[in-house]
Amino acid sequence: MASNSGHRDTRLLHGARTRSYGSLVQTTYSPAQIRKLEHQVQPGDTLQGLALRYGVSMEQIKRANRLYTNDSIFLKKSLYIPATAGQSDLSDDQNSQEGSETEGSPVKQPEKGEKQKSRHHVVQKDEMSPVDFMSRLDTNIRVSKRAAVKKLREGESFATEESTPGGAPGYQGNRTPSRQNSPQTQQRSLLGPVPLTITTRASTIRDHEDEIFKL
């Protein structure tokens, strides 16, 4: 009984071994089984994604590469991933499968005829042939000539309407009724200018003026 109590006291005195930062931890894997895989850092890589991809913890990756923050992986071109032999074989198989998929699905190259068609189509959109340019220029000149002739004809018709004696219906109200209904005006327009004639009254008045001048 005493021996059991003494053994228990010694266990309490020793206590459990506390772990602190930097202390060594025993693992079930030997150094021969742990391998370091080299991973080329890509623009979209994250520390969490790499840990899930290779089946390791983020602390192991940071410890193997001496990283202090999660965002400092882009400071290096490549990272070392600690992995066991089974994990390394699995990652090699995944890389080989990805390579075979890329090799098995060749990129379809466009045919020569399609290239020529697309190039010809682009040239037609960007540039215009001289024949098309001249035909378009002729069309524009023809349209402008037609518009000019139409304007000239409209001006001539308007001038002839103003020069006619009757005039347009809208201008009849502006004319004086004496010019429209005077028979003397119509007679003068038909016979022409009337010669000057000396009447007897005018001759007597002139003779009377001559007598007064003599006196």
Curated annotation (Swiss-Prot):
Q: Per its UniProt entry, which superkingdom is the organism in?
A: Eukaryota
Question: What InterPro entries does its record include?
Answer: LYSM1-4, LysM_dom, LysM_dom_sf
Q: Which residues form the LysM domain?
A: 37-81
SMART domains, alphabetically?
LysM
**Polar residues bias: start-end ranges:** 86-103, 173-189
Q: Which Gene3D superfamilies match?
A: LysM domain (3.10.350.10)
Region annotated Disordered sits at: 86-133, 148-203
Recorded protein name is LysM and putative peptidoglycan-binding domain-containing protein 1
